């Protein structure tokens, strides 16, 4: 039993946890972009047509999720349910390898949904190879799922999943729903699956990745976490910001929520828009919905101005990739989650009461709007406590004094996203590539005036190394300095600096 008692030193306390349990690993950069996910019986043509539409709308995606209908689901009842499956439905996807290769060509990583509980049954293409691997005759009897059986688990990864990965699957959405029970007391199948899938992924890719439910303390070592299923209600949205920030207290920083909600609830374009705005400023941005014809989260399904707001925010998520990936390294190296409660920085009593807001990396404070619009003014509001100093909204350019609370009203085009005085927000330049895997030779950096500041922009290079560019603002001298590494491998040829919080906005261009 460990007891961590750090008083108000929340950061130090979590670092103590990491000292004995290991830190959060680095995510692949593509995981930080926009994910498309829907529980829907797609076929290949419909899925690729949908990807065409996202591209035509200028909405960048980096992960393509294919829910459980990729595999056979309408099976002989004598085998059990169609919930578990490992054989592609070739009526829907005639050539799985070509389908996934086309998604890869478009810059998308691919993840497939699996429910492992019913094991491997005789109708599966992998049944006989699994039997051979386990030294048993293919009698038609099911191969039981058993996390306590080392031989089964070796074949589970080395035969069952490896065969599918050879067709192009990058990582797995492990949708375990069958409880914490196994043949060995205390051995939770979810924990074994999370560790196993992450470690197996890390052996195949430069950085591991799985996508599964939280299995208890220590789960931060096996990102990403799946929090679904979310109800489509304001109450459900209102719960997610404080739930996400609180995850930092146990080092669990990489939550993926059902952005927009999954099921039940009601249709509300304002709710959907506010949810996407929160999703863009959450650890993982994964649009998701059920198979209902009325619940899809394609932005063009919604009325204006919500549609325009969703598209602009999803573009902003992609533009934030340089910042997000720097915070990815920050989380791994320095023991900080991307989303943290404001009381990590400000220990005043108010910081412990305003739980709908949070720190988003080292530079931003975000206050999602989680209530309906006031019908009189057609705006929603967030009650925000600001730590000391000055804070500037990156959309409106308005500055606020810290050390006090504010009620901030916004129309449907934005939520309060505040950059600390002396803060820096690096963004992909407008018009740059929509591919999250690529390097970005042009950056725009938002800089908030009002205080001295320093930001270390950690970036990956073409040879998969990290380099650091230091940005410094001297408010007293009116000087902004960019110190590039001695051997700059970023390929960057242009910077655009946009100053916020001045009497009038101004920009400077550096070649």
Predicted feature locations:
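Accessory, solvent-exposed terminal regions and/or long lumenal/extracellular loops of proteins
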Residues: 414-510
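Catalytic-domain carbohydrate-binding cleft regions of carbohydrate-active enzymes
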Residues: 1-414, 420
């Amino acid at each position: 039993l460990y007891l961590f008692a750090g008083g108000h030193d929340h950061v130090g306390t979590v670092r103590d946890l990491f000292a004995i349990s290991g830190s959060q690993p680095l995510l692949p950069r593509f995981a930080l972009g926009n994910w498309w996910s829907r529980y829907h019986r797609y076929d290949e043509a419909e899925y690729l047509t949908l990807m065409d539409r996202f591209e035509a709308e200028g909405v960048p995606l980096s992960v393509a999720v294919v829910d459980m209908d990729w595999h056979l689901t309408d099976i002989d009842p004598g085998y059990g349910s169609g919930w578990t499956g490992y054989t592609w439905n070739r009526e829907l996807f005639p050539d799985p390898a070509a389908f996934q290769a086309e998604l890869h060509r478009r810059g998308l990583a691919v993840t497939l949904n699996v429910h492992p509980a019913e094991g491997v049954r005789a109708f599966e293409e992998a049944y006989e190879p699994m039997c051979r691997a386990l030294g048993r005759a293919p009698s038609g009897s099911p191969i039981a799922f058993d996390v306590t059986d080392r031989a089964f688990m070796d074949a589970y990864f080395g035969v069952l999943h490896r065969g599918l990965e050879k067709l192009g699957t990058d990582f797995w959405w492990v949708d375990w729903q069958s409880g914490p029970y196994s043949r060995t007391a205390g051995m939770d199948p979810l924990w074994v699956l999370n560790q196993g899938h992450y470690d197996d992924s890390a052996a195949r890719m430069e950085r591991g990745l799985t996508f599964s439910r939280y299995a208890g303390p220590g789960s931060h070592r096996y990102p990403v976490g799946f929090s679904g299923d979310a109800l489509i209600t304001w109450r459900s949205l209102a719960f997610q910001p404080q739930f996400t920030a609180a995850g930092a207290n146990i080092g669990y920083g990489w939550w993926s929520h059902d952005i927009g909600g999954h099921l039940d609830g009601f249709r509300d374009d304002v709710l959907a828009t506010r949810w996407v705005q929160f999703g863009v400023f959450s650890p993982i941005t994964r649009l998701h919905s059920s198979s209902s014809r009325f619940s899809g989260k394609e932005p063009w399904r919604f009325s204006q101005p919500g549609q325009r707001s969703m598209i602009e925010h999803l573009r902003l998520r992609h533009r934030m990739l340089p910042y997000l990936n720097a915070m990815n390294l920050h989380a791994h190296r320095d023991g900080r989650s991307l989303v943290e409660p404001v009381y990590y920085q400000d220990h005043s009593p108010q910081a412990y009461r305003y739980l709908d807001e949070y720190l988003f990396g080292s530079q931003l404070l975000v206050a999602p709007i989680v209530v309906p619009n006031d019908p009189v003014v057609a705006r929603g509001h967030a009650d925000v406590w600001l730590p000391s100093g000055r804070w500037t909204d990156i959309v409106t350019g308005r500055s606020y004094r810290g050390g006090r609370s504010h009620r901030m009203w916004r129309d449907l085009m934005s939520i309060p996203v505040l950059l600390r005085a002396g803060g820096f927000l690096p963004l992909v330049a407008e018009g740059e590539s929509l591919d999250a895997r690529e390097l970005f030779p042009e950056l725009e950096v938002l800089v908030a005036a009002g205080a001295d500041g320093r930001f270390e922009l950690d970036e990956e290079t073409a040879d998969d190394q990290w380099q650091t560019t230091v940005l410094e603002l001297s408010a007293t001298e009116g000087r902004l300095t960019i110190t590039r590494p001695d051997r700059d491998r970023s390929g960057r040829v242009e910077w655009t600096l946009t100053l916020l919080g001045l009497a009038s906005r101004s920009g400077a261009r550096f070649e």
